[in-house]
From Swiss-Prot:
Protein name from the UniProt record: Undecaprenyl-diphosphatase
The organism's taxonomic lineage, starting at the top: Bacteria, Bacillati, Actinomycetota, Actinomycetes, Bifidobacteriales
Family of this protein: Belongs to the UppP family.
Organism in which the protein naturally occurs: Bifidobacterium longum (strain NCC 2705)
Protein's job: Catalyzes the dephosphorylation of undecaprenyl diphosphate (UPP). Confers resistance to bacitracin.
Gene: uppP
Catalytic activity as recorded in UniProt: di-trans,octa-cis-undecaprenyl diphosphate + H2O = di-trans,octa-cis-undecaprenyl phosphate + phosphate + H(+)
GO CC, any one term: plasma membrane
Length: 294
């Protein structure tokens, strides 16, 4: 991978990370088209740190409030009043606990299915299937769901279901935001609430995954045939951070005025295009380097 290709992949990451269209699927597809090979799970996870840093910058006031209220309730002057220590009556502290609960599914599944995620699940036929299925689901749910829940209405049950939706993004093509937004809309959250919860809930999971992959890359960079090198990877990460911040602003304005129908149609169209490219042999379903890594 050269630096120009890294810049392109950084742009692709920034444009697709927050939208319910699957950034990992786009990185996989563009990587094959430009490089002739899959950039790999490590590259994908590390450049996602860039887009997540953009989330932290944009939502910095919310994040500071969540952390300060959470610590204040848990370790403050609430004494033996465990309901108060768990955030009763404090929306920010409660949201902090909900983010923790919502992170549990992806942590468990991410660790237990790590080898499958990095190899078998990167088959493009799987990507095509989930792009199509979750595109249809997003379209149906968004069109029919009620819109009466805000971020302050989230329960532990809802948080866990959000987490299950997020964990589906371990399969390239599902989309982390697509999974959580679909669940949120199905549970009756407004479009704005669903997308904001999706952003905040992703922070622990994406940072955790990115840091673990970075540590692995440091240890194995000489023997990992799929890792493109630190120079291109860091360039892509910086590009994804800068452009990602702009995309967040535009996406939040979009969902305040429009439905997710356009994204659902895009997913279905992309699934058809990738399927055709697979059939005619332009794209390989499984990259040879992934097979070797397995």
């Amino acid at each position: 991978m050269n630096f120009f290709q890294a810049i392109i992949l950084g742009i692709v990451q920034a444009l697709t990370e927050y939208l319910p269209v699957s950034s990992s699927a786009h990185i996989r597809i563009f990587g094959d088209l430009m490089l002739g090979s899959d950039p790999g799970a490590a590259f994908t996870a590390i450049i996602q740190i860039g887009t997540e840093l953009a989330v932290i910058l944009y939502f910095r006031h919310d994040i500071i409030n969540i952390l300060t209220h959470w610590f204040s309730c848990l370790f403050g002057k609430n004494g033996k009043d465990w309901k108060a220590r768990m955030g009763r009556g404090d929306n920010y502290a409660t949201l902090g606990w909900n983010i923790i609960v919502g992170s549990i599914p992806i942590i468990i599944l991410g660790f237990t299915l790590q080898n499958v995620i990095e190899t078998s699940l990167r088959n493009l036929w799987i990507t095509v299937t989930v792009l199509l299925v979750f595109g249809i689901l997003l379209w149906m749910v968004d069109a029919k769901a009620r819109q009466n829940k805000t971020m302050n209405d989230m329960t532990y049950r809802d948080a866990f279901l959000f987490g299950l939706g997020q964990s589906m993004a371990l399969i390239p093509g599902v989309s982390r935001s697509g999974g959580t937004i679909t669940v949120g809309r199905a549970l009756g959250y407004t479009r704005e609430a669903a997308v904001r919860l999706s952003f905040l809930m992703a922070i622990p999971a994406v940072f955790g995954s990115g840091l673990l992959e970075a540590i692995k890359a440091v240890k194995n960079y000489k023997t990992d045939a799929m890792f493109p090198g630190w120079g291109p990877t860091l360039v892509a990460m910086v590009i994804s951070f800068v452009l990602g911040y702009i995309v967040i602003i535009g996406f939040l304005k979009f969902v305040s005025n429009f439905s997710y129908k356009a994204f659902a149609i895009y997913r279905i169209g992309l699934a058809v295009v990738v399927a055709l490219l697979l059939i005619v042999g332009v794209l390989p379903a499984i990259d040879p380097s992934v097979v070797a890594a397995a």
